[in-house]
Amino acid sequence: MPSSSLAIRESPKLLKAQGSLLIAEPMKGVSYGEVVEVVLGSGETRLGQVIDVSRDATIIQVFGGVSDIDLKISKVRYRGETLKLPVSIDMLGRIFDGLGRPIDGGPPIVPEDYLDINGSPINPASRLPPSEFIETGISAIDGLNSIVRGQKLPIFSGSGLPHNRIAAQIVRQARVRGKEEKFAVVFAAIGVSYDDAMFFIENFKNYGALENAVAFINTADSPVIERIAIPRIALTAAEFLAWKHDMHVLAILTDMTNYCEALRELSAAREEVPSRRGYPGYMYTDLATIYERAGRVEGKKGSVTQMPILTMPNDDITHPIPDLTGYITEGQLVLSRQLWLKGIYPPFDILMSLSRLMKDGIGPGKTREDHRGVFMQLYSAYAEGVRLRELAVVVGTEALSARDRKYLEFADRFEKEFIGQGEYERRTIEETLDKGWELLAILPEDELKHVRIEHIRKYHPKYRGKTSR
């Protein structure tokens, strides 16, 4: 962190240490979010951040805890600046902790700049609508819930579901179409266990995923304030690569539930009045300051796309965290415990998932001309198959017509062959759409009401490769 141009001031007196908070006497000129140095009697220095200022006291969140701080001999120095991240193009291929410090054994970053981790809001008049397709290599996303550059599309998961494996797969496989386009992934693991942290680190290293990626890892035993800072630090790096180096950046943030739990813990320590289920009333606004940093800006070649991942407590999609996230973001990808128990990976619940901006990123020149019709037909056929599956439980399959049994066959194969794919299997959008046509061939042609006749003649396996094509 650069030295501040402002004079460093010392707090006159420390009043109390509580949890991870340090309470100091009020001091004129101290501002919210200001970085502080806590100097212990031993000479050790810890970073902290001002989280509340009042007439009676200044409350400081300390990185590293306050249990061993002697209030009589320790000092607090106010730096007169907010938390800044040293950024450089050399961050690509590196792994950092929750405060942006290298943890991969490599040399320190030689910064091109120091950027405020809170960023600056994008002028709404300067925003460009998301419109270009990002290929993740996962059929359930690319074919049916396409993500486009500048979008924010979360994954709603549950405890025990394979969201970490999916996140690692997307980091390995994601790319943009077009040889001249520069693409990078910024990955942030928030409050994960040591085992999960090692899974991500080893996975990225072993499969070469770090070549065009930056990883920030925050473990569960790190200070709470780090979990508040890490998504902002990751997005600061993403914005630097996008706006300064014209890269299309996909930012994956997992697990945002841990972030919200840290927000609740910090709110309780400050003795704030709780809102729904104990979370602070400003959680919606706080989440918006993170999610709204995605987008495309007029006059800039790069873009920031967000894919936050969160676990729904008790698989409850009405819980405040997924509920508020859904209000801010542009759709959701929902993981299904039922499909996971069937042995299907990745277990995306197609009927519960939605990408609101998909229509702007598919079609001729973006994916393929038949994409819209294929995804509508697959949705329709799968929904009908699920409905008939429930009916068959009551009346038995023998009572169903030949048409109905075709839809049952389609639904079963759709889950196994289209939604399901290998953890290290990457499908191009063309392979995904061709796989969709293979499954649609199960149904009679007169049932394909959502696809154009000319697309049937061109892509249907019955006609594919014939001269009429």
Swiss-Prot record:
CC per GO annotation: plasma membrane
Pfam families per record: ATP-synt_ab, ATP-synt_ab_N, ATP-synt_VA_C
Keyword Cell membrane found: yes
Membrane disposition: Peripheral membrane protein
InterPro entries registered for this protein in UniProt: ATP-synt_VA_C, ATPase_F1/V1/A1_a/bsu_N, ATPase_F1/V1/A1_a/bsu_nucl-bd, P-loop_NTPase, V-ATPase_su_B/beta
CDD domains: ATP-synt_V_A-type_beta_C, ATP-synt_V_A-type_beta_N, V_A-ATPase_B
GO biological process: one example: proton motive force-driven plasma membrane ATP synthesis
SUPFAM superfamilies noted in UniProt: C-terminal domain of alpha and beta subunits of F1 ATP synthase, P-loop containing nucleoside triphosphate hydrolases
Major subcellular site: membrane
Recorded superkingdom: Archaea
Compartments where found: Cell membrane
Keyword Chloroplast: no
Key words, A-Z: ATP synthesis, Cell membrane, Hydrogen ion transport, Ion transport, Membrane, Transport
GO molecular function: ATP binding; proton-transporting ATP synthase activity, rotational mechanism
Family the UniProt entry places it in: Belongs to the ATPase alpha/beta chains family.
Purpose of the protein: Component of the A-type ATP synthase that produces ATP from ADP in the presence of a proton gradient across the membrane. The B chain is a regulatory subunit.
Subunit structure of this chain's protein: Has multiple subunits with at least A(3), B(3), C, D, E, F, H, I and proteolipid K(x).
Name of this protein: A-type ATP synthase subunit B
GN (gene name): atpB
